[in-house]
Amino acid sequence: MSDNKSTGDSGKLLYCSFCGKSQHEVRKLIAGPSVYVCDECVELCNDIIREEIKEISPKQDQDKLPTPHELRAHLDDYVIGQEKAKKVLSVAVYNHYKRLKNAGPKDGVELGKSNILLIGPTGSGKTLLAETLARFLNVPFTMADATTLTEAGYVGEDVENIIQKLLQKCDYDVEKAQRGIVYIDEIDKISRKSDNPSITRDVSGEGVQQALLKLIEGTIAAVPPQGGRKHPQQEFLQVDTSKILFVCGGAFSGLEKVIEQRSHTGTGIGFGAQVKGEDDKATISDTLMQVEPEDLVKYGLIPEFIGRLPVLATLAELDDAALIQILSEPKNALTKQFAALFEMEDVELEFREDALKAIALKAKTRKTGARGLRSIVEGILLDIMYDLPSTDNVAKVVIDESVVKGESTPILIYENSESQAASAEQ
């Protein structure tokens, strides 16, 4: 019950029954049967309820851990090809979250952490694989670019900033962040320039590898709370990185030469050498499948860093057939995305088979893989997306090979004619 105190001339002054503040000290006072509650107390109650829900939800998520088969099936819906990499990732991710679910040593055996290293050319699906799994598991996901990282104390981004980004993704909920997935791209760019230790300081190469070691293996990272250094009086958040799954990826351009050099050692020189013909030469993707940890050391990664990434998966370069599939088959395929965009204008969008082949050929020529497909399609549809909102009675837009090659404009089919087709005019 609130104590209603008289203010004299102004009558009764109302007070919050919980905190005791008067109606003049708060923005809103909600009245009940002989009880009053202020807006500040309502907000406080909401915060308490939210915190309790957060504590319960991670346990519920753990009970619903998908099997490797289910993880693989979900990846198949969004990622074309890369079958071996999907299987490796599904098993590694399942084992990681199974380890978290059964925390503590099992019969005296402490389960190690299985971070992942993905090797594959640009646009082969490294980032997409990690991101798709994180979305399916409903865990926080963040990306970091290894080329922007430097050792602490130097100009650049500290490795601890990676954990801060992860915390930002889950509104600084430490428990949730500790179940997250971190993808570090361009990991090959921090390789040292030679496999001999350098006497000079390498703050963006070997130095970053050294800085990442503990973070990836598992340590208690001290991260500034929301607001960072602007509020130095606040305590730092303690994040246990041993529960975070780290996935590192890179193109590792030139690694195939290191592998070939190793595999050809001992085949003889001069007249005793085994000369390989054109038919014997393996593709770059086939060569990368034979990668060993010693090849990565020769490439420039330090042995300790490779040891923290025990799960290795190699992704093949996407061929024309795979690129065509990527354009049309996944749940979020580009053609489906743009078809949905055109549907908002009540217009049907059709890509003919020859158009898909021409788009795939363009991406192959640019050597951008699947990553370059969107920019190509955006360029093809730019003019028609500009004109369509101002054009009446268009029922369908058709894209064929000549449109992709820039030889003609998209075919427009109008509502008021069953078979009328006309080129889009500026």
From Swiss-Prot:
Q: Which NCBIfam families match?
A: clpX, PRK05342.1
Q: Provide GO CC annotations from the record.
A: HslUV protease complex
Q: Where does this protein hold Zn(2+)?
A: 16, 19, 38, 41
Q: Which UniProt keywords apply?
A: ATP-binding, Chaperone, Metal-binding, Nucleotide-binding, Zinc
> Per its database record, what is this protein's job?
ATP-dependent specificity component of the Clp protease. It directs the protease to specific substrates. Can perform chaperone functions in the absence of ClpP.
Report the residue ranges that make up the ClpX-type ZB domain in this protein: 4-57
Q: Into which family does the record put it?
A: Belongs to the ClpX chaperone family.
User: Which SMART domains does the entry link to?
Assistant: AAA, ClpB_D2-small, zf-C4_ClpX
Q: How does it assemble?
A: Component of the ClpX-ClpP complex. Forms a hexameric ring that, in the presence of ATP, binds to fourteen ClpP subunits assembled into a disk-like structure with a central cavity, resembling the structure of eukaryotic proteasomes.
Q: Which residues bind ATP?
A: 121-128
> What biological-process GO terms show up in the record?
cell division; proteolysis involved in protein catabolic process
Protein's organism: Shewanella woodyi (strain ATCC 51908 / MS32)
Q: Which GO terms describe its molecular function?
A: ATP binding; ATP hydrolysis activity; ATP-dependent protein folding chaperone; protein dimerization activity; unfolded protein binding; zinc ion binding
Q: Which PROSITE patterns match?
A: CLPX_ZB (PS51902)
Q: Organism classification, top ranks?
A: Bacteria, Pseudomonadati, Pseudomonadota, Gammaproteobacteria, Alteromonadales
Q: What is this protein called?
A: ATP-dependent Clp protease ATP-binding subunit ClpX
Which Pfam family would be a valid example here? ClpB_D2-small
Zinc keyword on record: yes
Task: Write down the superkingdom of origin.
Answer: Bacteria
